[in-house]
């Protein structure tokens, strides 16, 4: 049996980083088309209202303009691959909207994909470790990480590291939701972080 990639030439196989850049660029193009579609709908609705053909109460019923129609009107071309990609993008967006809450609830209880233990570090050392940790997590496209900072029982004047970690995570551009797990998994001595998606809809 021939290997799955046997018919592929080596130069046709994109490195991961290049493939991700291409996907991000395509996603930006689709977002541009989506913005143009919405602008076209708004413009058509305003013109119809001015003509008296569309009462305000019926504005929501205005006909929708597809992404491909906007692309054809603007660029005057038709590409079957692009049409298929637009349809797939719309399907993924609907699926993501339906399942995002369900997926987030599931992710909240899932086991973290990486762990950083900050015990014994100063706040300055912890920030440096966190910088490296989040950079690696983003490169690996992780969705959930665990940061162990302790409860500060052995610190004079109360916990110092935990508040510092919280401020760092809240200000980090790639960090999303953060929360403490159940006591049996570390409780307030541990912070779980859901990372923001680095590649849209993927």
From Swiss-Prot:
Gene3D superfamilies: 3.30.1370.110. This is Uncharacterized protein TP_0674. Pfam families: Smr. Residues 116-196 form the Smr domain. It comes from Treponema pallidum (strain Nichols). SUPFAM superfamilies: SMR domain-like.
